[in-house]
Amino acid sequence: MIKVIDGDLLSSKTDVIAHQVNCQGAFNSGVAKAIRDFDAEVYKDYHSFCSINTPEQLLGSVRYFESNGRIYANLFAQKSYGYDGKQYTDVNALRKCFENLRMNCINRSIAMPYKIGCVRGGANWDEVYAIIEEVFKDCNVELWRLDKG
């Protein structure tokens, strides 16, 4: 079941927090920055992983990191990033990440940001949400919306 919840993603009680990341080692804005500020170990692992893999190797993959009893899933669905309004999310890579997440977290509850891949990454929410519905049917997924806008 997919449920939309208003509030801070990091206050979720789910087993897994999943969010989209770029393949450049930058964890500087959006949910990534909030996670970095909340638990610096997640960022350190992500940055280290980026330093030993090329963006081409990372795109479409998921890096799992456990910290303080929670699993963080970094979904590599952006080869690069920018603040210019362009689309940086690779929707096919995001689907691949979602499929990996479902397979590896089948018996766990999952929280993700509402409009994942769309706010900073520029993807179309209707398209991404349709993929979420398809991939995560029969799963417990929470989509956290920081504000109702």
Predicted regions and their residues:
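Macrodomain-like recognition of ADP-ribose-binding/processing modules
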Residues: 1-149
